[in-house]
Regions:
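Sec-dependent bacterial lipoprotein signal peptides
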Residues: 1-28
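Extended alpha-helical regions
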Residues: 1-6, 111-113, 117-120, 195-201
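A structural "domain/chain start" motif
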Residues: 28-92, 193-201
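Surface-exposed short loop/turn segments
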Residues: 29-41, 104-171, 175
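Short secondary-structure boundary motifs at beta->alpha junctions and helix caps
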Residues: 72-87, 147-190, 198
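Mid-chain, structured segments of secreted extracytoplasmic proteins
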Residues: 79-107, 118
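Sec-exported extracytoplasmic/periplasmic mature domains
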Residues: 99-107, 125, 185-194
Length: 201
């Protein structure tokens, strides 16, 4: 009886794998992004560099009013939809990406007079056969005691070889798109004007 039970389990597992692959190929999968986590690269930027970054608070992040609400809700990769696990919003995913980096570095302080807010300006990904492309842009604003000290739009992009098979191309494109959030936060931390605005006092 045991060998038959094992064989049956293997068959079920095989069918489950085939169905998962088929769903990607057929274009009917919902693909949630992974929750934001601190990165070694951004942690190094927060702890090093000059001037040193002081404690900050992360305020509201919203979608640009000129954009359709759908831009904040999902991106399509060969008819599969990538969605944010943070309130179903890419603007909130960007906020959380920044927040967890600051928290991990011990720089998040709700009482700080330096507040970072953001506006999601662009969010896109394309994964045709050939070259895949993704882009993410946002405007970041730093206020200190109510006075604007920094206001700048930043953008990051990615391109990669996109294969024919959806079972490979779709997760690859989703990973490239998700990585842009960490890269955009990294670009913010590299900006000398931003560092000056949130410098330790």
């Amino acid at each position: 009886m045991t060998p038959r039970s094992t064989d049956s389990g293997m068959v079920r597992a095989l069918w489950a794998a085939l169905l998962a692959a088929a769903s990607l190929l057929a274009g009917c999968a919902e693909m949630p992004m992974t929750p934001p986590k601190p990165t070694i690269e951004n942690a190094a930027k927060l702890r090093a560099g000059s001037p040193a970054i002081g404690p900050v608070e992360v305020g509201k992040f919203t979608l640009d009013a000129a954009q359709s609400a759908s831009v904040d809700k999902g991106v399509s990769i060969r008819s599969n939809t990538v969605r944010s696990p943070v309130e179903g919003s890419f603007a909130q995913y960007l906020r959380e990406t920044l927040r967890v980096e600051l928290q991990s570095a011990g720089l998040l302080d709700a009482r700080s007079d330096a507040v970072i807010t953001g506006t999601l300006l662009d969010s896109s990904v394309e994964a045709p056969v050939g070259t895949g492309k993704a882009a993410l842009a946002a405007r970041f604003v730093v206020t200190r005691s109510g006075t604007v000290r920094y206001d700048r739009a930043l953008r990051t992009e990615a391109s990669w070889d996109s294969p024919f098979m959806g079972v490979s191309a779709i997760p690859q494109a989703a990973g490239q798109y998700e990585a842009l959030y960490r890269k955009l936060v990294g670009a913010l931390l590299d900006d000398a004007a931003f560092r000056a605005a949130v410098a330790r006092q």
